[in-house]
């Protein structure tokens, strides 16, 4: 989708040649049902990348990415993996680290581009590169959104029409949080967000305001740090 294509555009501005990879990684899915239902549109994806001008598309098979069997490596992400998504998806980020490290070792890029939509994943990949000392620079690319603010995602096609309309609450809430950040405390912001979701059809797994580097949740805004809000 256009969110993925924005990664290509960012890469093309700074590199002579751009390779896009497509691989559905089974070790980062905690729920086998989610893996089975994940949208698979390979031919359409390749067509879009070709139209955009990508120089090459790498579509490895399972054996190429997991020559020693379907196992994840264990990483020390210095606690990044224990926050937010990590609390609900144990082992997920080891799966991410394993597949991205293998991809980098095979392709050997100078630069790699990942969307900020999965900000925790972006932080994890930066930490993996730091730990493994791979010679690649990781770049984050701002989230691309639909006109109503919903982040572009392959999984959006699985939403019903009603769910799709209701999903805009996420971006609307984050936009409010950005304004509240200027005048309210962390605790006051949290209470307001919880109230918004209490009156919605969504069950809120987490709302976190965290240090953008460590992803550690904060209960106070320190002037020398930058923060991000996550739903």
Tell what function each PLM region has.
Residues 2-202, 210-220, 225-227:
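Nucleotidyltransferase catalytic core that binds NTPs
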Residues 207:
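Substrate/ligand-engaging "lid" and interaction regions
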């Amino acid at each position: 989708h256009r969110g993925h294509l924005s990664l290509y555009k960012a890469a093309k501005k700074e590199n002579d040649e751009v390779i896009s990879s497509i691989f559905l990684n089974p070790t980062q899915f905690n729920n086998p049902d989610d893996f089975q239902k994940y949208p698979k549109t390979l031919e359409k994806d390749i067509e879009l990348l070709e139209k955009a001008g990508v120089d090459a598309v790498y579509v490895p098979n399972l054996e190429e990415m997991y020559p020693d069997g379907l196992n994840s490596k264990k990483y020390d992400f210095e606690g990044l993996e224990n926050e937010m998504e990590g609390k609900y998806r144990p082992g997920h980020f080891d799966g991410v680290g394993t597949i991205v490290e293998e991809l980098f070792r095979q392709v050997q890029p100078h630069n790699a581009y990942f969307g900020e939509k999965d900000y925790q994943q972006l932080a994890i990949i930066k930490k993996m590169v730091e730990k493994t000392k791979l010679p690649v620079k990781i770049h984050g690319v701002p989230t691309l959104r639909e006109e109503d603010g919903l982040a572009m995602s392959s999984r959006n096609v699985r939403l019903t029409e009603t769910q799709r309309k209701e999903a805009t609450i996420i971006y609307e809430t984050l936009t409010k949080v950005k304004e509240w950040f200027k005048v309210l405390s962390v605790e006051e912001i949290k209470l307001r967000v919880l109230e918004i979701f209490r009156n919605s059809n969504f069950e809120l797994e987490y709302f976190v305001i965290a240090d953008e580097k460590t992803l550690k949740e904060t209960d106070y805004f320190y002037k020398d740090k930058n923060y991000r809000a996550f739903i």
